[in-house]
């Protein structure tokens, strides 16, 4: 299970572990808002292979240029180690160019199960049907719908906050059955060509 604060304007999109060459965790964040983000404070937990916390770092990145509806990078200095296997990142506070702020409220966190598929023929077929941003089949979960791109959204939201796909389209075109139908149709088209 994972947790997400659906109100957070800076969504964690991707992480890169620290290495000897780059002794820092590189976080790719997505600015969901209509305003420029200039600073982000994160809490970074470094985890071992059993999920145990080996280190905890609070870091504030400044002079960022998080353009609206775009990705931007935040580099958190930390040394690599042999036991480091994963990162757990929590966005704690966001500063906008207009001096407004957003602060995480633990009461807003909602639990969800990620839908990411492992590298497999099923994922390849899904990417054929839904595009390269697809990570897993959509699902409905306790007041949320998880998009094909992996983003949880409130049940009443008609469009995904990350990729903009409509919920109706996601659930009609990208279920396992719908993807299989698309693949079968394409195979028949190729066979008759």
Model-derived regions, located:
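Hydrophobic residues positioned within well-ordered beta-strands of beta-sheet architectures
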Residues: 25-27, 40-42, 57, 72-74, ...
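Detector for glycine-centered tight turns/loop "hinges" at secondary-structure junctions
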Residues: 34, 49-52, 98-101, 150, ...
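Intrinsically disordered, low-complexity Pro/Gly/Ser/Thr-rich segments with frequent PxxP/GP/PP motifs
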Residues: 50-85, 97
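Short acidic/polar inter-strand loop motif in beta-rich domains
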Residues: 93-106
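Cys/His-clustered metal-coordination modules, chiefly Zn-binding fingers
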Residues: 105-193
């Amino acid at each position: 299970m994972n947790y997400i604060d659906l109100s957070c304007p800076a969504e964690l999109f991707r992480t890169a572990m620290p290495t000897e060459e780059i002794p820092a965790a590189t976080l790719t964040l997505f600015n969901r808002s209509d305003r420029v983000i200039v600073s982000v404070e994160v809490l970074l937990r470094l985890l071992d292979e059993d999920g145990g916390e080996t280190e905890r770092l609070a870091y504030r990145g400044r002079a960022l240029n998080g353009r609206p509806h775009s990705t931007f990078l935040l580099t958190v200095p930390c040394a690599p180690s042999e036991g480091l296997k994963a990162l757990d990142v929590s966005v704690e506070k966001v500063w906008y160019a207009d001096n407004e702020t957003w602060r995480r409220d633990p009461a807003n966190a909602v639990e969800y199960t990620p839908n990411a598929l492992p590298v497999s023929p099923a994922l390849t077929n899904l990417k054929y049907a839904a595009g390269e941003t697809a990570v897993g089949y959509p699902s409905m979960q306790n007041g949320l719908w998880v998009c094909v791109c992996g983003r949880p959204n409130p049940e009443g939201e008609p469009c995904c906050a990350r990729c903009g796909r409509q919920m109706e389209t996601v659930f009609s075109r990208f279920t396992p059955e719908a993807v299989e139908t698309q693949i079968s149709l394409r195979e028949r088209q190729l066979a008759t060509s």
